[in-house]
Design a protein with these regions (language model features):
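Catalytic activation segment of kinase domains across protein kinase-like and atypical kinase folds
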Residues: 267-303
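Short histidine/acidic/glycine/proline-rich micro-motifs that form metal-
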Residues: 63, 128-132, 282
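Acidic, Ser/Thr-rich intrinsically disordered and amphipathic helical segments
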Residues: 67, 71-74, 106, 142, ...
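Active-site activation/catalytic loop segments of kinase-like enzymes and analogous catalytic loops
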Residues: 290-334
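ATP-binding pocket architecture of kinase catalytic cores
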Residues: 96-235, 246-253
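Regulatory N- and C-terminal appendages and interdomain linkers associated
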Residues: 2-95
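Generic alpha-helical structural context detector
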Residues: 77, 190-193, 217, 294-297, ...
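An alpha-helical support segment within catalytic cores of ATP-dependent transferases
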Residues: 68-89, 93-94, 98, 200-259, ...
Length: 334
């Protein structure tokens, strides 16, 4: 039975507005009161550079002044109606860009309730274009829906072709320094154990090695020959095979891993001291030891510095810190 996380909120939440799996580029078509698809003419694009290869370029400048696309307005009206709100006056909406997302663009959208207070909040996520090189968007959507149903992460409120509307989590995103805080680190360790024990659909097949090969092939296809030689891409193929052979054992504990537990994907409710893991683009079955090790590696990064692409390995956790984290993980009920 799936281990269900503790909900951060206990107020009424509307049912999810589902969408047809056939995400075509046609104009909005209603299949039922809660089933619709939306098209979007302009999509964000992915730029590449030698130093920071995944910088997003978005085309949603109109969101800032409140001029939302008509298709999105229809989604918000439908989501609002589930709360008993009437979202007709789009001029009353507050649209606030949120920073920190790497493969999407996210906005906080507020609208007044019947009492006239701006206290209804949702999160709008616009998918980035070109990220299919790194993960499968359909798999990510299915994972998000499953997590939402099991009380993990934000609740899914609505979907459209190039994005979705999510529950707004009233918690703060961690900072790079937070990962080194003893109390917060212990909370993260316990939450990881719970996450790994989730009973998720699909075969428990390790994705790590094939994903690395796919990423390597993608990197080779977009880099000039001199870069392939300079960065020794060919030797990386041999290294992946060597690691797979050395680290693939029957005794390894395979669980559903987040695979991207950097500080920006971890939220903390200061009142309840509850941890929420968000953004499941890379989530899959893998050895749980890999997810732990990857989290340690993320401690050397600061994506909000002037040089987000430079990793400071002097900040890698020492042996005692790693032992403490693993001990907390193992002692947690999950």
């Amino acid at each position: 039975m799936c281990q269900i996380g503790i909900r951060l909120f206990n107020w009424y939440e509307p049912p999810c507005v589902t969408v047809s799996q056939n995400l075509t580029r046609n104009p909005i078509r209603f299949y039922s009161r809660r089933s619709f698809i939306i098209s979007k003419e302009e999509k964000p694009k992915l730029c590449h550079s030698k130093l920071f290869p995944t910088k997003m370029v978005m085309k949603t400048n109109g969101f800032v002044d409140g001029s939302l696309p008509d298709e999105l307005k229809k989604v918000l009206r439908l989501v609002g109606s589930e709360w008993g709100d009437v979202v007709d006056d789009m001029e009353s909406l507050q649209v606030i860009p949120l920073k920190g997302a790497m493969t999407n663009e996210v906005f906080q959208i507020n609208w007044p309730t019947k009492c006239g207070n701006l206290d209804r909040k949702v999160l709008l996520r616009i998918y980035g274009e070109g990220v299919e090189a790194f993960f499968n968007r359909d798999d990510e959507i299915r994972t998000f829906e499953c997590m939402s149903k099991h009380g993990q992460g934000p609740r899914l409120l609505g979907r459209f072709a190039d994005g979705r509307v999510e529950e707004f989590i009233h918690a703060r995103t961690l900072s790079a320094a937070d990962l080194r805080d003893y109390e917060i680190s212990a909370l993260v360790a316990a939450k990881m154990r719970e996450f790994h024990n989730l009973e998720m659909p699909g075969p428990r097949t390790v994705l790590l090695w094939n994903r690395m090969r796919d990423w390597l092939a993608e990197a080779k296809s977009m880099c000039p020959a001199r870069c392939v030689k300079e960065f020794r891409f060919d030797s990386l193929e041999d290294e992946i095979s060597m690691l797979e052979k050395e680290l693939s054992h029957d005794y390894l504990d395979i669980g559903f891993c987040h695979n991207d537990l950097q500080y920006g994907n971890i939220m903390l409710d200061e009142k309840t001291r509850s941890i929420t893991l968000i953004d499941y683009e890379y989530a899959s079955f893998n050895p749980v030891a890999y997810d732990l090790a990857n989290h340690f590696c993320e401690m050397v990064a600061n994506y909000h510095s002037e040089t987000p692409h430079i990793l400071d390995y002097s900040k890698y956790p020492g042996l005692e810190e790693r032992r403490r984290f693993v001990a907390t993980y193992l002692s947690s009920a999950g």
